[in-house]
Regions:
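C-terminal hydrophobic helical "lid"/dimerization subdomain
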Residues: 1-5, 252-256, 297-347
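Residues at the starts of beta-strands that form the adenosine-phosphate
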Residues: 6, 170, 193-194, 263, ...
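NAD(P)H dinucleotide-binding glycine-rich loop of Rossmann-like/cofactor-binding domains
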Residues: 95-174
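Short amphipathic alpha-helix with an adjacent loop that forms part of the alpha/beta core around
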Residues: 224-235
Length: 347
């Protein structure tokens, strides 16, 4: 094995990302080394690329970025027992400390001592990535590597969508990005009655129709959400909301159109704090729950089972590039008219 590898590095405290030669990671006894085959670009990667205030506050420079990937185990540490060389895998990107009350109670996704692959720890936009055995997700032999590369964001969608009962319920999704659209597909498979998704980007709304047959789309710059709700036969309000946008107007519209006693799962992160009309939440007896990442590891089991039973998300991938074409891939992401964008790290 060579001593160095190609990797996309946040090498400077400015806009951009750079392909560099860096040392291949050396694994610890409890870690595995994964040969990366495919990666996908995430919204977090775009924050790092644009070097916005969040990235400046959270990402040390230099840092190998990326955390959505599929690959193959090529080396295991001396204490690794469950994972084998040659196994096809993906990985949970949140590396936890395992000593907090939440972690020791099995709520690992709520461990306050959490570090992110590609954010605080060297990431997967590289030929190789190292990962604790605890975080490794073995994959079925017939799962395409392109799909393996989008399991991380699909997990966010599954965690959000399955927070509340969906069978026979009317669902409102605010934000038609890839995770919002994937959450719609999950809700449809889980038995939701009507699904309405909103955005201000018409391309995204049309894309949602392609991915999720029967979904109702609303461009809130042109159509009232309340009127759209009534036009599809929802009389009293939405039963369950998935807030995926982090946008204040979208959140306000969601609260206004929820049924009395409705449930809201919130994944979208606002770019800055905004006020909340708590009176409406109280008087409508709404239940709201914040969603962070994926439940470790129930979400992974559920999404792999849903894929095995027919959840088809192949078309959510709209662009594929070789790793050397990374700038083209990031430019596509910046353009805003795409689903998931894949980078191929195979020779």
């Amino acid at each position: 094995m060579p001593q160095t590898m190609k990797a996309l590095v946040k090498a400077k405290s400015e806009v951009g990302i750079w392909m560099e030669d860096v040392p291949i990671p050396t694994i610890k006894p409890n870690e595995v080394l994964i040969k990366v085959h495919k990666t996908s670009i995430c919204g977090t990667d775009m924050h790092i690329y644009k070097w916005d205030p969040w990235a400046q506050a959270n990402v040390p420079v230099p840092m190998v970025t990326g955390h959505e990937y599929g690959g193959e185990v090529v080396e295991i540490g001396s204490t690794v027992r469950r994972v084998q060389v040659g196994q096809r895998v993906s990985g949970e990107g949140h590396v936890v400390g395992n000593v907090s009350r939440n972690a020791r109670s099995g709520r690992w996704h709520l461990d306050p001592d959490t570090k992110g692959i590609g954010v605080n720890l060297p990431g997967a936009f590289a030929e190789y990535v190292r990962l604790p055995e605890f975080n490794v997700i073995p994959l079925p032999d017939d799962l395409p590597m392109d799909i393996a590369a989008i399991l991380d964001p699909l997990g966010n969608a599954v965690h959000t969508a399955l927070t509340f009962d969906l069978v026979g319920e009317d669902i409102l999704i605010t934000g038609a990005g890839p995770i919002g659209i994937m959450s719609a597909a999950v809700a449809a498979k889980a038995g939701a009655r009507r699904i309405v998704i909103t955005d201000i980007n018409n391309w995204r709304l049309n894309f949602a129709k392609k991915i999720v047959p029967g979904i109702h789309t609303v461009d809130v710059t042109k159509e009232s959400l309340k009127d759209a709700m009534k036009s599809v036969g929802i009389q009293e309000g939405f039963d369950v909301g998935f807030e995926m946008s982090g946008a204040e107007p979208a959140f306000e519209q969601m609260i206004d159109t929820m049924i009395m006693g409705g449930n809201i799962a919130m994944l979208g992160l606002p770019s800055k704090p905004f006020p909340l009309d708590v009176g409406k939440v109280v008087l409508k007896a709404l239940t709201m729950r914040g969603i962070y990442g994926r439940q470790m590891y129930d979400t992974w089991y559920k999404m792999l089972a849903m894929i095995d039973s027919g959840l088809d998300l192949e078309d959510i991938i709209t662009h594929r590039f070789e790793s050397q074409q990374y700038q083209e891939a990031f430019d596509v992401m910046l353009g805003g008219e795409c689903g998931k964008v894949i980078l191929n790290w195979n020779d």
